[in-house]
Structures are given as C-alpha cells and as structure tokens.
A protein has these predicted regions:
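Extracytosolic low-complexity repeat regions of secreted or lipid-anchored proteins
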Residues: 50-119
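Short, surface-exposed binding/anchoring microloops in extracellular/periplasmic proteins
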Residues: 8-50
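N-terminal low-complexity, Pro/Thr-rich disordered segments
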Residues: 1-8
Length: 119
C-alpha cells in the first residue's frame, strides 16, 4: 500500500454527523446563518485539510429574519485536530478567506468548529 493511500480517518463535525470531505458545511447549526457549499478539497490529511468553495451568509440587516444572503468565493483550511468525546479525530478550527468584505467587516477569519455532534 502506498503511503498516500492510507485512510486518514479524520473528520469535520457537520452539526449532526461526522463527515470526510463534505461538499457542504454548516458553520452555525442553530440557524444555518452561514453555509459553505460547493466545496472542492485539494488535500485532506491527518493535520489539515485545504479546500475552496462558496460561502452563503445572512447579513442580518435589518434583522436576521429580513436579511439577505451574501455570497462569496472562499478558500478554506481546517486545522488543529483533536479527539472528540466519541473517540474520532476531528478538526477543531476553520480558517476562511473571502473574496470580498463580509457583513461583519472581515475578509478572513478563524472560527472554532464543534468537536462532537449535536444530539
């Protein structure tokens, strides 16, 4: 077996499931206020994953109910693997670089990812 054919067995928590290389990733499970989709992963290793896709985020102006979606191209990096309570290795941080300024005023951010599924 070639070294790069080894199953890495590392996941990202996507609200209620552990997923490898998801095409869509919900960042805020409570209200789905931001979703990364059309993700294409260029690498997925035990230490980091790198991908690109599209961010759809609610601008919450004047309120989140009445807000509009802001759509941006993104580059994504998942890092800082940890063990979940259920024993799976999961990434605990996501770095996002946007192609335009977001409603929050940023063009890049680092967020904590959930490390276990919501029951």
């Amino acid at each position: 077996v070639a070294q790069n054919d080894v199953n890495t067995d590392i996941y990202v928590v996507n609200c209620v499931t552990f997923e490898e290389k998801p095409v869509e990733l919900v960042l805020y499970c409570a209200d789905a206020g931001q979703i990364l989709n059309e993700i294409s992963w260029s690498s997925w290793t035990p230490t980091e994953a790198i991908g690109a896709g599209t961010s759809t985020a609610n601008d919450c102006e004047p309120s989140c109910v009445e807000g509009k979606d802001v759509i941006s191209a993104v580059e994504i990096k998942l890092t800082q693997p940890v063990k979940s309570e259920s024993g799976k290795s999961v990434y605990s941080k996501i770095e996002i670089q946007y192609d335009k300024v977001q409603p929050s005023g940023v063009m890049d951010e680092v967020l904590d990812l959930p490390t276990d599924v919501f029951n």
